[in-house]
């Protein structure tokens, strides 16, 4: 696998969110059978192992989250950063890099966006705490700036059941 990634100059898009519920949730919540939970854990551990091997072999890694899968929300991408930190063991800075500059590079738009610097385009979130210290700070967005317009305290429709279940896995 590593050889093929290097030959093709490919990126690995690590996506832990879809497998986490099937691997780690109580089956009474997911309604998964014992076999489905076993298989979910095989997939989850495989994703973690693949990400670790890619990083150890200098394969570029980015993050995805497969919005549309059960237990995945459009407002929770920050969890994917937390999961790669917690389960793969990367630093908070590396997690942020995979979701910003590295993702822009993979998309072929790294010269235009992905980092905050003169001449580049950027949509920004403003948060009260430093995600380099704790990635969970990303969940409390104070402001969004997009295309030059700011949105103070954006309101997001949150599913409390999904949030409560997923929050159980935010402990380091």
Model regions and ranges:
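A short C-terminal boundary segment appended to hydrolase-like catalytic domains
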Residues: 164-172
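Structured helix-beta-strand junction loops
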Residues: 4-8, 57-58, 138-141
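Extracytoplasmic/secreted cell-surface and envelope-processing proteins
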Residues: 1, 71-74, 136
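Active-site core of metal-dependent hydrolases
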Residues: 1-45, 68, 104-107, 128
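C-terminal cap of metal-dependent C-N hydrolases
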Residues: 99-101, 118-164
């Amino acid at each position: 696998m590593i050889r093929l990634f290097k030959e093709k100059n490919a990126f690995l898009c690590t996506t832990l969110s879809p497998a986490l519920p099937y691997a780690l949730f109580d089956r009474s919540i997911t309604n998964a059978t014992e076999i489905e939970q076993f298989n979910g854990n095989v997939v989850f551990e495989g994703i973690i192992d693949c990400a670790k091997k890619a990083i150890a072999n200098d394969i570029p890694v980015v993050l995805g989250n497969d919005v549309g899968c059960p237990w995945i929300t459009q407002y929770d991408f920050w969890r994917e950063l937390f999961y790669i930190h917690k389960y793969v063991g990367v630093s908070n800075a590396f997690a942020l890099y995979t979701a910003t500059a590295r993702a822009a590079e993979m998309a072929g738009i790294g010269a235009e966006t992905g980092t905050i610097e003169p001449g580049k385009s950027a949509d920004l979130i403003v948060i009260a705490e430093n995600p380099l210290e704790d990635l969970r700070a990303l969940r409390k967005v104070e402001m969004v700036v997009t295309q030059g317009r700011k949105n103070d305290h954006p309101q997001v429709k949150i599913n409390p059941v999904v949030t409560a279940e997923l929050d159980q896995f935010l402990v380091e």
